[in-house]
């Protein structure tokens, strides 16, 4: 049940971010809306959210979640462009979080750049950590043609 709940939370965060990105600028005489593009998902609590700036995301999750490590980050575009999703958890490296077995709506098959923060990040072609995979150390402005827009799950257990 926890896996279903956390997968739902990740999908909800992705949908909220995607909805914010799809909001038309300048609709009906309103000021243009800056899209939310900085998303965070904390696996241990199921907390997630998307914000229009990194400082808003840090303010929302930073102080309350010092026990959690920033494991890694993915972006929807190359060169850390587009939307960003940061994965946080208490287990750290060497652990395959079941909650990351499916990137869910909004992030599935959209990853173009990745960064392993606390440890290397592995992108998997299919959900449930199946199919072709590539492990990245540090920041990678482009995940390469073999994995670009193909990742469906993420792990932090391979070196």
Predicted regions span which residues?
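Compact beta-sheet-dominated domain cores in extracellular/mature segments
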Residues: 2-18, 23-159
């Amino acid at each position: 049940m926890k896996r279903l709940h956390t997968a739902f939370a990740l999908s909800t965060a992705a949908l909220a971010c995607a909805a914010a990105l799809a909001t038309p600028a300048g609709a009906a005489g309103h000021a243009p809306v800056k899209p939310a593009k900085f998303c965070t998902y904390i696996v241990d609590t199921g907390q997630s959210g998307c914000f229009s700036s990194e400082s808003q995301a840090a303010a929302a999750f930073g102080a309350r979640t010092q026990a959690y490590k920033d494991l890694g980050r993915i972006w929807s575009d190359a060169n850390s462009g587009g939307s960003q999703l940061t994965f946080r958890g208490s287990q750290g490296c060497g652990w395959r979080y079941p909650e990351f077995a499916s990137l869910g709506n909004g992030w599935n098959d959209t990853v173009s750049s990745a960064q392993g923060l606390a440890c290397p990040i592995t992108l998997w072609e299919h959900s449930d950590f199946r199919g072709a995979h590539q492990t990245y150390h540090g920041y990678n402005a482009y995940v390469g043609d073999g994995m670009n827009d193909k990742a469906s799950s993420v792990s932090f257990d391979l070196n």
